[in-house]
Amino acid sequence: MALKMVKGSIDRMFDKNLQDLVRGIRNHKEDEAKYISQCIDEIKQELKQDNIAVKANAVCKLTYLQMLGYDISWAAFNIIEVMSASKFTFKRIGYLAASQCFHEGTDVIMLTTNQIRKDLSSPSQYDTGVALTGLSCFVTPDLARDLANDIMTLMSHTKPYIRKKAVLIMYKVFLKYPESLRPAFPRLKEKLEDPDPGVQSAAVNVICELARRNPKNYLSLAPLFFKLMTSSTNNWVLIKIIKLFGALTPLEPRLGKKLIEPLTNLIHSTSAMSLLYECVNTVIAVLISLSSGMPNHSASIQLCVQKLRILIEDSDQNLKYLGLLAMSKILRTHPKSVQAHKDLVLQCLDDKDESIRLRALDLLYGMVSKKNLMEIVKKLMTHVDKAEGTTYRDELLTKIIDICSQSNYQHITNFEWYISILVELTRLEGTRHGHLIAAQMLDVAIRVKAIRRFAVAQMSALLDSAHLVASSPQRSGICEVLYAAAWICGEFSEHLQEPQQTLEAMLRPKVTTLPGHIQAVYVQNVVKLYAAILQQKEQAADTSAAQEVTQLLVERLPQFVQSADLEVQERASCILQLVKHVQKLQAKDVPVAEEVSALFAGELNPVAPKAQKKVPVPEGLDLDAWINEPLSDSESEDEKPKAMFQDEEQRHTKPRAPEADEQELARRREARRQEQANNPFYIKSSPSPQKRYQDAPGVEHIPVVQIDLSVPLKVPGMPLSDQYVKLEEERRHRQRLEKDKRKKKKRERERRGTRRHSSLHTESDEDIAPAQRVDIVTEEMPENALPSDEDDKDPNDPYRALDIDLDKPLADSEKLPVQKHRNAETSKSPEKEDVPLVEKKSKKPKKKEKKHKEKEREKKKKEVEKGEDLDFWLSTTPPAATPALEELEVNTTVTVLKEGQEEPRGEEQDAEEDREQDLEKKPSKHKKKKHKKDKEERPKDKRKSKKKVPPADEEAAEPVENGTLEEEPLPPMSSYILLAENSYIKMTYDVQGSLQKDSQVTVSVVLENQSDSFLKSMELNVLDSLNARLARPEGSSVHDGVPVPFQLPPGISNEAQFVFTIQSIVMAQKLKGTLSFIAKNDEGSTHEKLDFKLHFTCTSYLVTTPCYSDAFAKLLESGDLSMSSIKVDGISMSFHNLLAKICFHHRFSVVERVDSCASMYSRSIQGHHVCLLVKKGEKSVSVDGKCSDPTLLSNLLEEMKETLATC
């Protein structure tokens, strides 16, 4: 054995370690892949050895190779083997490899559960730490579910190192297993007050990350975080807390008033720029939430703006960027405070950093007004000329358009100026936003009726110079403006001064070089112009001119018919045939202008955004159904694809015409020249497309004009925007003078001889009137448009599942799964619980001392709860108790738990068998009698008795507060009610709801065969109502029944469950139903049916939910519940049995019981809270109820009245 160990050690000396692998890779640069492939083969051999040290060394090398991009998933099992090594050095290598290559799709990851659990419970903090670190990288939903309880236990570890890691990994666990958030949250909340600053920082980090997506669930932590903010000196913790308050403030405006003073103090005192920025950010959020609710907030705004100016003027580019970012937030609510710093923002446009320039542009968007719009756009246009790089220039262009068009053009007072700006932007070279300029031209021309004449004139000039725009090297972008120009000139052709000149410009041969969609618009709008010209000529009785225009179209349209674009071909062909038909009519002197114009009658208005989405889907139309069923894979493979129209291969392979010789070419050229010379419409000076003639001989004599596009293009007839700026300034000056004159005359009439600073008049946006009357056309919507819904949230968002109410009491179903041995439950039997009671009898002298300690502890706990209560903390005085509920509130007590003792949980006990087991577990009668005797000996003063906390050896208070009653034996009870019965079958049913499904209940029907026949083919059908509907199998109609999934031999009973969907639960209802079945016996088979009425009571919709006294008291204090009460006389049943009957039949749990008074709680499947105060007199019982729905409460009390009447 010793020789074997020595041999193994010697072998390991010659194994390659990580350093050797790295050195070898560096030495094999030429054949690196081949060398690594050899190394992987060696590693595979090493992994087959039994020695764990060799395996760890191999996994270490694999980890390095994985970093180089090699797949090592094949070694996942070997990695788990190294993870399970006892030596920490090897274990660490295994966890490192797992954290790099394990993911949710790794097959063997399920094998790590027990190993990780073992390492988490290891006495070595380093084993536990490496397991937590590794798990955080490859945690899956299954691992999170199985290990959540173990990690939660580590949050209370004695070592801060482990506590910190456990707190941090809980965030990953919450994302993968959201159900663990509520059980773990109280312990996570405790870590906020951990003595170790590292653990405290970790807890702050986790809660702040959770609250970032769902802040409303963490409002209750505001007092605790406020305490941390005012006491902590850690800047990192302060930044996190202040960020959280920034998210919470919009949800609770009262919080802002609390925060404004400490945040202002921090802004004044801190030297850390990061903390200063977060404070300013949160103050902005506070002021936005308060809006006008805080009278003197202008000082805080000015303070923030001054501090942000310091950040923007700083040489650090990061601080400058953050300052601009925060300034944009202030701009939304307090624009005037930011507009004073316009000079600083404009300076940022000259910054070298493009991101800062872009952020300054975003800020300018909100700083514009009617008064300064022209000035800001003028400066931006200057920057457009100087801009380097197409990205920034495109962003400038976009921002100019956004600034001008925002809020439906509310800041533009002169639309002629805006049209001239758009035309100037068409001169930009290399822009990708030609379509954006075109969209604005179209939008302004359509919406603003007063500007159409001017817009048409500018677009006509643009079409005349279209050859300049179209021949630009980047014409694919900017030539989009020709699309808008052609459409505007065609649609509003009545405003054209020279429509024939524009028509000729649109029919030039150069147009055929434009993109297909632009040519299509040209062709369509040529006809509109043609219709307008025809009307003019016919009105002037100039038939020859009308015929000439028709001839022009007949000659020029064929060039579009031959276009490669199908849409252009189709439009041109249709229009050519139309024009030819018009030409025939003109030859007969038939007037056709009115008929042609009628083709384009009416106006085209803008369509509202998302109009298509708002069109209601017709009834019976299934948008997801196939129109034609797709072929199966086998069919599609067999069939060969066929050409849709003709065999393309044949078209391309047909024999071509023989090439012409030199003489033939010369003859054709001469014929073409003669044709061009005789054609009056041929523009001889227009250069032919270069690509058509560049290889043809004898074209050197044709003059070709080269255009230097580096020189800014000036289209003749287009006024510059600067001229409109001057005109606008003069117009506003005249307007001011007239207004001042009117004011002066008015003052002189009122007060002779007095002067009121007329020279100090300041112009506001409201004072500036637009240059022309603006009639903005509204957007059109489809008929019966549906209201617009917000876009659906991402269903894959991991934070969506964490939107959980953390203040709601924890239900039994929400407990974390804990692995137990099979006899774990039996070890906690009541018989064994009686043992400590016997010990306590011998410690009677200490009972008073224990009571005193518990009172002190209770008082401290109440003070802490008051400090942490959000409403109490935010209000100046604590809220007063409602007089009607004073007695109930006095009765509420707080169960004080010893350290390390788990909080008691209430259990739902609906079935009779569970209750019988509870009866068997109750203490002896002797103990009960002694307990009653002690009660009778107590003083009868209510206040004294209510303030007392029962000692630990008396079991009456604790079990009652948990919702179970342990006194005298209870009569047998069953929740199943008779539904229907005949000679064949007996039906009983019970209705159960679930808090997880707010619109569904499950009806459990027990079917008992009372005959000698064999019952089969059973089918249950219930007639649906408006409020309740039976859930049927997919594809079934409302008349189909639900088959019962079993058969009943004679004397056998079985249970079937049926799901019903319920709309409203506030009223009881009955549904008619039928059970049909076949009864088979020796004589044969018969079809039978049994009619029944299914009764859904309001109690059916309640779910037994435990509630503790502090939460119960808060619920009553809220003031959101409606109140009602009943009183029933002639009650002889004991109070204990009475409460048990209410709990069982009406699904309530006891919150607290004092003598013959008890508070009870239940909750409906739709979240209605139901609170009861049950008081027993000598022969009567009164029930006071509170509920969030008054109708539900009154119906519940009526049902309870029927139950109590039988007691």
Curated annotation (Swiss-Prot):
User: Which Gene Ontology cellular component terms are annotated?
Assistant: AP-3 adaptor complex; axon cytoplasm; endosome membrane; Golgi membrane; presynaptic endosome; terminal bouton
Q: Where is the composition biased (Acidic residues)?
A: 777-794, 952-969
Query: Is Chaperone one of the keywords?
Result: no
Ranges annotated as biased composition (Basic residues): 741-759, 841-854, 923-933
Which InterPro entries does this one have?
AP3_complex_dsu (IPR017105), AP3D_dom_metazoa (IPR010474), ARM-like (IPR011989), ARM-type_fold (IPR016024), Clathrin/coatomer_adapt-like_N (IPR002553)
Q: Which Gene3D superfamilies match?
A: Leucine-rich Repeat Variant (1.25.10.10), Longin domain (3.30.450.50)
Membrane spanning segments where? none
Q: Which residues carry this modification: Phosphoserine?
A: S632, S634, S636, S688, S758, S759, S764, S788, S829
Tell me the Gene Ontology biological-process terms attached to this UniProt entry.
anterograde axonal transport; anterograde synaptic vesicle transport; Golgi to vacuole transport; neurotransmitter receptor transport, postsynaptic endosome to lysosome; protein targeting to vacuole; synaptic vesicle budding from endosome; synaptic vesicle membrane organization
Please indicate which superkingdom the organism of origin belongs to: Eukaryota
Transport is among the record's keywords: yes
Q: Which residues carry this modification: N-acetylalanine?
A: A2
Tell me how this protein sits in the membrane: Peripheral membrane protein
| Subunit-level organization | AP-3 associates with the BLOC-1 complex. Adaptor protein complex 3 (AP-3) is a heterotetramer composed of two large adaptins (delta-type subunit AP3D1 and beta-type subunit AP3B1 or AP3B2), a medium adaptin (mu-type subunit AP3M1 or AP3M2) and a small adaptin (sigma-type subunit APS1 or AP3S2). Interacts with SLC30A2. Interacts with CLN3 (via dileucine motif); this interaction facilitates lysosomal targeting.
Tell me the protein's name.
AP-3 complex subunit delta-1
Q: Which organism is it from?
A: Bos taurus (Bovine)
Its gene?
AP3D1
